[in-house]
């Protein structure tokens, strides 16, 4: 099947002077030695810088920790794959037969890596200004989202606010088990809410982490 790279360029709103950059950025390691692995390395750093710079300018009152959490939220693999799916990136990937058969064009990790590689390809082809422009275009709806700062709140806080807004009782966290050696303990926590049938569980290296994971699991259940 012939892949129409010009169509992808239109979706990216960027025309490559050297289409070889784009083709390499779309080539998985299973499809050849001239693949996107090195591009991915470069694209990861470019994306991180552009998003960090944008957040720094948009949120002058945020602390370093808050800016770091926002950046981590925006550049995580799941977010990259989500953006990749929005532009139909999976349809343009060059994959080996094994990856094709196993549905690699839908895999979150492959989509995320390929998107980072494309950002590197744009940088190599058109410079930092072009790369920044495309990154901010792809991220515009997320950067402008009034709920973006919700990711700064931990899971227990988000769950409590959700329950209060929905007129539910507050959650109860119960430590049900601690296992393992003293220097490598595993804590098990159960989260329940009076009047709610769902039960959520969290496991972590300390009680706080286990409670946070249980709260996250409960919130995901309640929000469907």
Swiss-Prot record:
Highest taxon of source: Bacteria
InterPro entries the record matches: dsRBD_dom (IPR014720), RNase_III (IPR011907), RNase_III_dom (IPR000999), RNase_III_sf (IPR036389)
GO molecular function: double-stranded RNA binding; metal ion binding; ribonuclease III activity; rRNA binding
Primary enzyme class: hydrolase
Active-site residues (renumbered): 44, 116
Keyword Lipoprotein in annotation: no
UniProt record similarity statement: Belongs to the ribonuclease III family.
Protein name: Ribonuclease 3
Species assigned in the record: Legionella pneumophila (strain Lens)
């Amino acid at each position: 099947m012939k892949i129409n790279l010009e169509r992808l360029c239109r979706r990216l709103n960027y025309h490559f002077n050297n289409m070889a950059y784009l083709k390499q950025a779309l080539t998985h390691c299973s499809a050849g030695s001239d693949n996107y692995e090195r591009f991915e390395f470069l694209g990861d750093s470019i994306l991180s810088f552009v998003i960090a710079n944008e957040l720094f300018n948009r949120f002058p009152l945020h602390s370093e920790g808050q800016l770091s959490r926002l950046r981590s939220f925006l550049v995580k693999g799941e977010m990259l794959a989500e953006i990749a799916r929005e532009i139909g990136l999976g349809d343009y990937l060059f994959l080996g037969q094994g990856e094709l058969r196993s549905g690699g064009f839908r895999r979150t990790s492959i989509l995320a890596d390929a998107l980072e590689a494309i950002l590197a390809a744009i940088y190599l082809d058109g410079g930092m200004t072009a790369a920044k422009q495309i990154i901010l275009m792809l991220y515009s709806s997320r950067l402008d989202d009034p709920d973006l700062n919700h990711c700064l709140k931990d899971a227990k806080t988000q769950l409590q606010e959700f329950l209060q807004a929905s007129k539910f009782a507050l959650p109860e966290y119960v430590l049900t088990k601690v296992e393992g050696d003293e220097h490598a303990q595993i804590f098990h926590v159960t989260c329940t809410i009076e009047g709610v049938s769902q039960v959520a569980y969290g496991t972590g290296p300390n009680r706080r982490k286990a409670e946070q994971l249980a709260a996250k699991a409960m919130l995901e259940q309640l929000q469907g």
